[in-house]
Amino acid sequence: MSDDATFEKFRACTVEVLQVPEDKVVLEARFGDDLDADSLDLVELVMALEESFDITVEETELEDVTTIGQAFDLISSKL
């Protein structure tokens, strides 16, 4: 899967779980400040991404993830 296709799948999952407009899901967007996502939203998103991409993300890997770009990089590194 190309990076573009991977990001589109990532974006679709994020839009569905966080209930945000697609145009807000950009690499620079911060979960808390730009997308109004709290920690429960992020747990839900990670669970959905794990299922969608058939991967496992450890809780400790999420500690420094604050932006869409960081989350996408983490997911991409597991593919």
Residue ranges and their predicted role:
Residues 33-51, 70:
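Phosphopantetheine-attachment site and its flanking helix in carrier
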Residues 1-23, 76-79:
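Thiotemplate assembly-line natural product biosynthesis machinery
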Residues 68-76:
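Short, cationic-aromatic polyanion-contact patches
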Residues 8, 23, 43, 66-69:
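Residues in well-ordered alpha-helical elements
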Residues 17-36, 52-64:
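Phosphopantetheine carrier-protein modules
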